[in-house]
């Protein structure tokens, strides 16, 4: 298998066996051809009875006709094309929750575009893990708060795989400080990436999904968007905005069979929580009824259900908390 590398937001072109794909972002593309096992042919039919039976010419003709029909039926079944793997775009997928989501969907058989802003090496490792599962992945560097980057990202997925079935908007940052000390630049940074980025990605994906009258969008917000948190006025505002925005997007997309839902994590184990002192951790865990941190895989499991399960086809416009009970 050959791997073709392309570079970040200054692109060149991507060569594949099918030809050339041109775009302006840098990415790394890997594709594993799925293994197709043809259905086995049935051999001669055997009668389970040992009793002798008479055979007439009409019976022989009838049996031959049935055998021919069975062979044709088997051939038709073999000719049925394999269901295509869903194409998924996951933003902020180089680490933490985004990484867990990308790996979960890749393991489930999806073709995954792994978006990152600065962590190219980590994103590349995520793609390699997806490939190890037998999947396909594109690693794409881009800032989701910039419209040109978002358009190039969506084009990359469509050029590589023909469509986009699922988008998971996970990219986000924090710039924590008390409200009275918060600089406008700290406010703007968080709103631009955490809210405007979701708007741009959802808008771009919806245009593609509306044409095929099908799609699923999962936006990662936070329990902070529901209950607030000291020192996170900017973050809480952005995540509350994501929830309201997603409900409107769900109403507008419903007529085209586009489901839009929100996942609101609470305290999830991360590099940051690992560095907290014992006293701080004790205080945090005291606010969680289940008394422990969630794991990135907990969030990924819920996202996978909303993204892929037929049982989630009638769910839209909902905000799901996965927080150990903080928002009860």
Curated annotation (Swiss-Prot):
Kindly list the positions annotated as binding NADP(+): 90-114
- Biological processes annotated in GO: fatty acid biosynthetic process
Q: Which domain of life is it from?
A: Eukaryota
Which sites bind substrate? 222
Subcellular location(s) per record: Plastid, Chloroplast; Plastid
Name the catalysed reactions.
a (3R)-hydroxyacyl-[ACP] + NADP(+) = a 3-oxoacyl-[ACP] + NADPH + H(+)
Q: Give a single Pfam family match.
A: adh_short
Q: What GO MF annotations does this protein's record show? A: 3-oxoacyl-[acyl-carrier-protein] reductase (NADPH) activity; NAD binding
User: Where does the record place the catalytic residues?
Assistant: 235 (proton acceptor)
What Gene Ontology cellular-component terms does the record carry?
chloroplast
Q: Which UniProt keywords apply?
A: Chloroplast, Fatty acid biosynthesis, Fatty acid metabolism, Lipid biosynthesis, Lipid metabolism, NADP, Oxidoreductase, Plastid, Transit peptide
Q: Which InterPro entries match?
A: 3oxo_ACP_reduc, NAD(P)-bd_dom_sf, Sc_DH/Rdtase_CS, SDR, SDR_fam
Q: Indicate the family of this protein.
A: Belongs to the short-chain dehydrogenases/reductases (SDR) family.
Please give the name of this protein.
3-oxoacyl-[acyl-carrier-protein] reductase 2, chloroplastic
Q: Which organism is it from?
A: Brassica napus
